[in-house]
Amino acid sequence: MKIIVLGAGAWGTALALSACSNPAARHTVTLWARDAAQAAVMQARRENVRYLPGVNLPPALGISSARLSDASAAPDSFGRLIDGADLLIVATPMAGLRAMLAHLSACRVPVAWLCKGFEVARSLETLGLLAHEVQAQEAPDLMAGGLSGPSFALEVARGQPTALVAASVHAVVRDTLVAAFHSPTLRVYANDDIVGVEVGGAVKNVLAIAVGLCDGLNLGLNARAALITRGLAEMTRLGVALGARAETFMGLSGLGDLVLTATGDLSRNRQIGLALARGQTLQQAVDSLGHVAEGVYSARTVVQRAAYLGVEMPIAQAVVALLDGQMKPVEAVAALMGRDPANEQP
C-alpha cells in the first residue's frame, strides 16, 4: 500500500514510522513536510529533531517537501507525490485542516485526518466545526474519516502497544485505515460513528486542562476521579446532542483518550493546566510548551456549541473562564464545588 502522511509533526512522524516499520505489510510510506528546511534535516539526519527527537527514521521512510501549489507531473511535484497513493493521511493541526482538504478535494482515494478539536468559528455569526463538518464544506466528495484514540506519539514511535479507532461513514475508509496501520504493536478498531469519535477527541483536550489544573493544585486523587467522571458525562451529553451514539464515549476515543490525556504527563493539554496551577499566564504556558495544545483553541467552541444546543457543561465552562482570565484557578475550583446538589446524570 502506498501511504502519504501530510504533516511532519510528532504524530504524523510517529504514524508514518509505525506504518513503515510493519514487517508484515510492506507499505511504501512517504512523510511530507511543509518546511523544506525541516525535510532536509530529516533526510540528512534520519531524525525529526524538532518534534520527535531521539527516534530514528528508517531508510525506507521517504521524506518530501513538495510544494502544495505544484500539481504538475514533475518528479518533485506535490501532484506526483500523491499520484497513485492508496491512502492520504492529513497530520496537520485543526487550524490547517481546511486548507489541506481544499488541496485534496479532487482525490478519489481514502483520506483520513489525525487532528482532534474544533475549528475556531470563522465569524461572530458562525459556530466552530468538527473535522467532518469542515470536510463537508471544503471537500464534500472525499471518502474521508479520522484516526483517533489514546495515543502519545512518542510511544507509538517506540513501538509500544497502542489501540486506535478508525472512524468513517465509508466502509472503504475504515477498512483501508485498518489495513494500513494494524500491526503487532498497533491495534486498530473500526467505528462508523464519526461524530462521536470526533467529539471525544475534541472535548477530552479541554477536560485534560481541568485535570492538569487539579493535579497542579494538589487537590488529590478523589478530585481527579470526579473531574474525569463528570467530564465524561459532559462529553457524552454534547456528543449525543450532536448526533453521536452514547456508547461511543465508553470506547477508545472517549473514555480511553480522556484518561490518557488527562493523566499522562506527555499530554500537552494537561501541561497547560499544570502550568496555570503554578501561576503562569496562558501565554507563558503556551510559549513554554512549544507545541499546539488543541484544548486551548477548542475550549470556547465547545462551550459555544453546547450553549447553542442547550447542553450543560460546567467543567468546560470553568476552563474557558480560566483561559480567558475571568477566574483564578482556586476560584474555578470553588465555582464547580459550589454548584447546587443534583441527581447524578450521565
UniProtKB/Swiss-Prot annotation:
Disulfide cross-links: none
SUPFAM superfamilies: 6-phosphogluconate dehydrogenase C-terminal domain-like (SSF48179), NAD(P)-binding Rossmann-fold domains (SSF51735)
Pathway assigned to this chain's UniProt record: Membrane lipid metabolism; glycerophospholipid metabolism
Active-site residues annotated for this sequence: 204
Gene Ontology MF: a single term: NAD binding
A Pfam family of this chain: NAD_Gly3P_dh_C
GO cellular component: cytosol
Residue sites binding NADPH per the record: 11, 34, 116, 153, 268, 292, 294
Transmembrane segments: none
UniProt entry keywords in alphabetical sequence: Cytoplasm, Lipid biosynthesis, Lipid metabolism, NAD, NADP, Nucleotide-binding, Oxidoreductase, Phospholipid biosynthesis, Phospholipid metabolism
PANTHER family documented for this protein: GLYCEROL-3-PHOSPHATE DEHYDROGENASE, GLYCEROL-3-PHOSPHATE DEHYDROGENASE [NAD(+)] 2, CHLOROPLASTIC
UniProt-listed NCBIfam families: PRK00094.1-2, PRK00094.1-4
Family: Belongs to the NAD-dependent glycerol-3-phosphate dehydrogenase family.
Name of the protein in its database record: Glycerol-3-phosphate dehydrogenase [NAD(P)+]
Organism classification: Bacteria, Pseudomonadati, Pseudomonadota, Betaproteobacteria, Burkholderiales
Gene that produces this protein: gpsA
